[in-house]
């Protein structure tokens, strides 16, 4: 393992090797500090914004990978400038049994450290790779490229994994666009209806209309996005997006970006339930079941839109931070 150790008491080749490791760890730490600094200062996004960046880690058990993870966490824990919390990149810890979750797992020590860092800096967030919907049938513990079969998220909420048009993976893909539905407003518009079941029926009717509009808006935006040519994105279309290596400079990017996702977001579920029932999902089992019905409607409609428009529609909970 690449860990910085005091050289006192070491001699010969052992001292030389540890000196080299100490120098390497110091350089890696500086690199992680620089990475975090750059991600919070490079204004290269549209409208001169800081790039919304995210990084998923935690399952690399090699000495080099563990060193990078440890120094990334250390830099995050110490903060930037005078100790402030860096907003970017959004950091996501990939939790996996046999890798970093149980005390006997090789990266368990880093998982414990990640929990400590998260308690202080709110990062990293955590994704459970053991959840049934996050498992990949091709994942094997001894596979050096198992990361290809591990779910990753963009930011703290946008899951990119299933793919109707290619391999199920997060590698080489991303979210193209997303629109959020304010379901609180829909619920408030129904509050004047005194009969509970009729109030809920009206809410779902309004929700269905808005879901249709949202899906159409995302489709039409994609129709514009797909007209771009590969030469307009020399970095993305040279080595990053899956399938981009097959494109010629004058080719449109449609076949490549359609492997990404179009996100339909929702916001305000708890407040929505209060407006409809008087209680939120943590206060009443009936409200909890209604909340599940609402999100299920989002997912069912997303599946329907995926068939109709031939895209990867996804559902996400918009944090609105």
Please state what every model-predicted region is.
Residues 1-259, 279-280, 284-321:
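Conserved catalytic cores of very large enzyme subunits
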Residues 262-275, 296:
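Contiguous, well-ordered alpha-helical segments that form the cores/surfaces of helical PPI scaffolds
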